[in-house]
Amino acid sequence: MSHRQSCDRCRQQKVRCLRDESQGGAGNKARASFSRCERCTKASVDCVYSLKSRSNRPNAHQPIHNQVDADPQTLVGPSWFGQGLFCQAASGSLGPDYDDLAGQFADLDGAEFNGWDGNLDVIPSLSMSSLNTLAAPAAMVSQDISPTKDHHDNNHMQEPEADDDDESNNGHDQDAIQELSLQLTAISQRATRAKRRLHRAGCPPPTVSSPEVNEAFEDTNNLLRIANNITNACAHLCDEASSNSITLDYGLVFSALASHQHLLALFKAICHLIQRYLESMTSANQHRQQQQQRLHDGDIGPSSVAQFVMVLQLLTYLINRMDRNLAQVNGPHGHGLETSLGGQATPITPSTGYQDIVQSMLIHRGDKNNTTGSSQSLPIIGQVVLGAIPDEHKRLRQVIQELQTRIERSEIQ
């Protein structure tokens, strides 16, 4: 008799039952397999047989969710935990230890005990209809939250987009203003450095290809371009009366005027350098030897004089362009305006100098003893500078004409 068909006592002792299997013939073979064991009879104990282990073949009526994906070959072990809980949950596959446990209850039907786990629905199966039923409330909630075309909050939802557009436009304007401010600052710095180089001793004679002359030409073009952008922005601001229009940064106006003043100072330095070389060429006979040495060192000759003429013509061209673009503060008669402390505007004639205007303004202020304080001195000086721009251009053109006349009358051609 095999070990699986032995009684519980013999199986625990790991021996085979000694039974008379011939009793009852072949028809009583099933009953004979559960006959009393000779070992139990000799020991005067009850012979208990456990239920047989059913095959691991799954039952057709078993729910799919009761089958576990674990491999029974890797999980089967001597313990009830490995054989019963984690074994493949086929119908009746509770493991031999569960069979031993069931054998202690003689009045329990084996078929019903082996099939209890296969018919028990621990987790009820869900059909697609039930899933759709559960998902329906969530869809209804999402539909209630989503706005419709007639929803009263549409205007509120569109307001952040308008704010984003305004912020992007303001950011773009600030970047453009910063870029123009940096360009104007660079123009002033380059003009100041070039003017200092021209005032140094031993500076070569200026030509149309000199770095200082090239910087004067390029920076003047850049300044006029920036000035046109500022005036166009101001005209656009005046045309639009809307409160959403972009405010003009007036700091750019003062920066442009400062760059204009530095370029005028550079023009004057170039004219002064040409005047020095012309004076060295027309010195008296007693300094002829020293003059020849200077001519040799500075390469002064007819070619240099021709370069002087071209440089002066270039300066005249640049000043005329400034007149057309920057000197628009003058009135219809072509004169600037001087604003006194009393608020009265008096015309500035071309014969009136800039320093005379400032000096008379300061004297007038000291005599009047105005109580407004020094906070108005800078704006008043700024107004004087603006009114003197046409006069500054005219006096610079007069200096250039004098130099051109001197070159024409000189003996070195």
From Swiss-Prot:
GO terms for cellular component: nucleus. Disulfide bonds: none annotated. It holds the Pfam family Zn_clus. Induction: The fujikurins gene cluster is specifically expressed during rice infection. InterPro entries: Zn2-C6_fun-type_DNA-bd_sf (IPR036864), Zn2Cys6_DnaBD (IPR001138). One of its GO terms (molecular function) is DNA-binding transcription factor activity, RNA polymerase II-specific. Residues 7-47 bind DNA. Keywords: DNA-binding, Metal-binding, Nucleus, Transcription, Transcription regulation, Zinc. It is found in: Nucleus. Its main location: nucleus. PROSITE patterns: ZN2_CY6_FUNGAL_2. Residues 147-159 have a biased composition (Basic and acidic residues). Residues 145-173 are annotated as: Disordered. Transcription factor that regulates the expression of the gene cluster that mediates the biosynthesis of fujikurins. This is Fujikurins biosynthesis cluster transcription factor FFUJ_12243. It comes from Gibberella fujikuroi (strain CBS 195.34 / IMI 58289 / NRRL A-6831) (Bakanae and foot rot disease fungus). The lineage of its organism: Eukaryota, Fungi, Dikarya, Ascomycota, Pezizomycotina.
